[in-house]
Amino acid sequence: MSYYRKRLSPISPSQPIDYKDTELLRKFITERGKILPRRITGLTSKQQRDLTEAVKRARLMALLPFVNQEA
């Protein structure tokens, strides 16, 4: 019988996700600029919602590109 380890979130639950912290936000988007899904990031559902909102806000404020065409 195998046991599954509980996955820990890469961000502590007490750490706020801020739209101005672009270095943190870039860890959770692809090289094309798409937001990575929760099953890949390992975030909790609330953190994923906050991350999505922060990325979208950062895009509107021109801190992150909508589409990254470098690739």
UniProtKB/Swiss-Prot annotation:
Q: Does the keyword Chaperone apply?
A: no
Q: What are its GO biological-process terms?
A: translation
Q: Which InterPro entries does the entry link to?
A: Ribosomal_bS18, Ribosomal_bS18_CS, Ribosomal_bS18_sf
MF GO annotations = small ribosomal subunit rRNA binding; structural constituent of ribosome
Keyword RNA-binding included in the entry's annotation: yes
List the SUPFAM superfamilies. Answer: Ribosomal protein S18
**Pfam families assigned:** Ribosomal_S18 (PF01084)
Q: Which cellular component terms (GO) are annotated to the entry? A: cytosolic small ribosomal subunit
Quote the subunit structure annotation: Part of the 30S ribosomal subunit. Forms a tight heterodimer with protein bS6.
Q: What is the purpose of this protein? A: Binds as a heterodimer with protein bS6 to the central domain of the 16S rRNA, where it helps stabilize the platform of the 30S subunit.
- What's the name of the protein? Small ribosomal subunit protein bS18
Q: Which organism is it from?
A: Microcystis aeruginosa (strain NIES-843 / IAM M-2473)
